[in-house]
Curated annotation (Swiss-Prot):
Subcellular location per the Swiss-Prot or TrEMBL entry: Cell inner membrane
A family per Pfam: STAS
Topology class, membrane: Multi-pass membrane protein
Annotated GO biological process: bicarbonate transport; sodium ion transport
Protein name as catalogued: Bicarbonate transporter BicA
Length: 566
């Protein structure tokens, strides 16, 4: 397997332009997410460079742009807030938080190495929509304090909501005006201009220039980013807290899993735009390496970013070279122009992050979820509430569990209709003319027990119900020829029906056992109780043998009609 991503120079012009355009979009977003996370603008920039570089170089989606994203920032905010509060010093807490980022990267590398990529996006859409919308709401709520010109209160979402009256009573008009103006520019900028220059960059530059002249740094106490240190970052030594180690593992797992989902969903978008197919397992390894190195050098966690990826593709990017160009451009900005960011108002960055939060919310599905599926809508709303008020991992776990239970119930109900007991040819089941003849000759003493389709554990109840409803008989023909897969629970229910029939000294025939179904029954040792001459591949032959076993005199002079379907 090729170690690096797909890189060639046949599309060098498109890749360079795509990378440059993606870098222009990434700059304001990285600054905003760095500040929003609590780690600072510098951490956001280095996260954009390092995650973007290593994910592009070693990932499995050639056009994917990786950087700090809204969902990852929400989790990072909680991680940083917790460990800076619980550690002996804020610096130690920040080191632990960056260690969690490294651990999240290791988790992603493990997920990719175990080839779990294909399972990540098999989550029900109601759950994905719910937790993404919940993350969007969290990001919006967390920006309320800086949006209103004040420092964020502790306690995350709950703390912000509890302090909302205080925040509103101490509103800073100048900073709030800058934040509102930022949102207005991004929201209402004409589409024809958006295609030329990203509205986030326009809002960042205009907001900074206006603030510089209206609120001069020398005389105003307007909150700004402050100077970002030029040069390469220092290595962050991994720091572990024995008391908090369990919390570190859990946070790293959540961050890693969210990064996997975020990246692979964006990879699917990239596939649809480029008509290619990504390598999900390779992508997870690339994302993991990106987050590992980002944490190692004091950057926040990142994942595949939909906006940057789409812009990269639309600008001509087709290989991983575009992602590498983007990372190089951002590196040049950090090393050569870091001082220019010192006067950027925090309110402008809050406005950018606020708009990202609004965009993350799945408005399209929220508006029509109740029309598509009331149960699905309830799952989505439940996941949103749990994400916002409890915990992301709890929200996803509960959402997936409930969605799967409902799906299993629907599948079981559909498959239960394919569990039938037939006593005569008048029953609603397709039989050949010969099979109908033999079933009629059985005079109700021979029953055909037919199963078809995959038999999951939810069908066990239907098998037991049909078996219990059987009338008195002398022979049972179990037809499983149309069962491609049989789960453990369903096979045990079938075993129980066969064992009970044998205990009552009834003749038992098994028809059509093949493939996985046969192997399952062999493991249950059923074929030791049902002799080979009664394990047949032909339903007609099984019915004939069952009838003749009860009425041997019918063997004399019996003529078998043709076998066309009735």
């Amino acid at each position: 397997m090729q170690i690096t991503n797909k890189i060639h120079f046949r599309n060098i012009r498109g890749d360079i332009f795509g990378g440059l355009t993606a870098a222009v979009i990434a700059l304001p977003m990285a600054l905003a997410f760095g500040v929003a996370s609590g780690a600072g603008a510098e951490a956001g920039l280095w996260g954009a460079v390092l995650v973007g570089f290593f994910a592009a170089l070693f990932g499995g989606t050639p056009t994917l742009i990786s950087e700090p994203t809204g969902p990852m920032t929400v989790v990072m905010t909680a991680v940083i807030a917790h460990f800076t509060a619980s550690a002996a010093t804020p610096e130690e807490g920040l080191a632990i938080a960056f260690t969690v980022v490294m651990m999240a990267g290791v988790f992603q590398i493990i997920f990719g190495s175990l080839k779990l990529g294909k399972y990540v996006t098999m989550m029900p859409y109601t759950v994905i929509s719910g937790f993404m919308s919940g993350i969007g709401i969290i990001l919006v709520i967390l920006q309320l304090a800086p949006f209103l010109g004040q420092a964020s209160p502790g306690g995350g979402v709950i703390g912000t909501l509890q302090n909302l009256p205080t925040l509103l009573s101490n509103i800073q008009p100048g900073e709030t005006a800058l934040a509102l103006g930022t949102v207005a520019i991004i929201w209402f900028m004409p589409e024809k201009f958006k295609k030329v220059i990203p509205p986030q960059l326009v809002a960042l530059v205009l907001g900074t220039v206006i603030a510089f002249f209206v609120f001069p740094p020398e005389v105003s106490d307007l909150r700004r980013i402050g100077e970002i240190r030029a040069g390469f970052p220092e290595l962050v030594r991994p720091s572990f807290s024995p008391v908090e180690f369990q919390r570190m593992i859990l946070d790293a797992a959540v961050l890693g899993m969210l990064g996997c989902i975020d990246a692979l969903l964006t990879s699917v978008v990239a596939d649809s735009l480029t008509r290619t197919e990504h390598n999900s397992n390779k992508e997870l390894i690339g994302q993991g390496l990106g987050n590992l190195f980002s944490g190692l050098f004091g950057g926040i966690a990142g994942a595949g970013a939909t906006m940057g990826t789409v812009v990269n593709i639309q600008s001509g990017g087709r290989t991983a070279l575009s992602g590498l160009v983007r990372a190089f451009v951002l590196l040049v900005v950090i090393l050569g122009a870091a001082s220019l960011t010192a006067t950027i108002p925090l309110a402008v960055l809050a406005g950018i992050a606020f708009k990202v939060g609004v965009d993350i919310i799945d408005w399209s599905f929220l508006k029509r979820a109740h029309e598509i599926s009331p149960k699905g809508a309830l799952i989505m709303y439940g996941v949103i509430l749990l994400t916002v008020l409890v915990d992301l991992i709890v929200a996803v776990g509960v959402g997936v569990f409930v969605a799967n239970v409902l799906t299993i119930e629907r599948m079981s109900n559909l498959q239960s209709e394919k569990v039938q007991t037939v006593s005569d040819a008048d029953d609603n089941i397709r039989l050949t003319t010969t099979e109908k003849r033999w079933l009629d000759e059985g005079q109700g003493r021979v029953l055909l027990f037919q199963l078809s389709g995959p038999m999951i554990f939810g069908v066990a109840k239907a098998i037991a119900r049909e078996h219990n409803a059987m009338g008195d008989c002398d022979a049972l023909v179990f037809d499983i020829g149309e069962v491609p897969h049989m789960g453990v629970t369903a096979s045990l229910a079938l075993e129980n029906a066969i064992e009970e029939a044998l205990d009552k000294e009834r003749q038992v025939y098994i028809v059509g056992a093949a493939g996985q179904t046969r192997r399952r029954l062999e493991k249950l040792k059923l074929f030791k109780r049902v002799p080979p001459d009664k394990c047949l591949m032909s339903r007609e032959e099984a019915l004939k043998n069952a009838v003749l076993g009860i009425y041997p005199h019918l063997a004399d002079g019996v003529t078998a009609p043709s076998s066309e379907m009735g």
